[in-house]
Amino acid sequence: MNKLYAAPMEGLTGYLWRQVHAALFGPADKYFTPFLSPNATRTFQRKELDEIDPAHNAGLYVVPQLLTNRAEHFLWAAGELYARGYREINFNLGCPAGTVAAKRKGPGLLAYPQELDHCLEEIFAGLPRGMSVSVKTRIGKNDPAEWPGLLAIYRKYPLSELIVHPRIQKEFYKGVPHRDAWAAVSGPWPAVYNGDTFTPV
């Protein structure tokens, strides 16, 4: 059975939008928050706290999304989210913004597969018991040829889902998705397609 996930769009799909969407159209199977950016301060911004306030997400399946390249920052946020009742987190390796990629975050981290592998290893070694992690990814930063190596890394870890946008970071949302890259996806986790989904006419 097909499921409908509401992907995040910064500045648009915050908690008020989620509440209104669910009330008017019925709830999506999952809502992903706009990304939270845990860092060395070990604090969330006010707007981030609003996004993850359990009272703002009552009755909805909400998955907080994290954008970072440091396992220790991810794990700090995981502990905070676990304490608020969340049991699934999404690791954002898909946001194509140049300012994100330049910091080796999002798909910027995909250009450094050893760092990505080490980050995932530390995350899964330190997660709170009962917390699961899904990954939202592009198929590479600069070249679709990066995809087989990245896919081999993802296959090493017990992801709850692998969400794939079959474009590289440099393509942003332009051109035709690399359907062959999506067709190559296989692993020990459910795979979810993202990008260029249109209603039939």
Region spans (language model):
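Flavin-dependent oxidoreductase catalytic cores
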Residues: 1-201
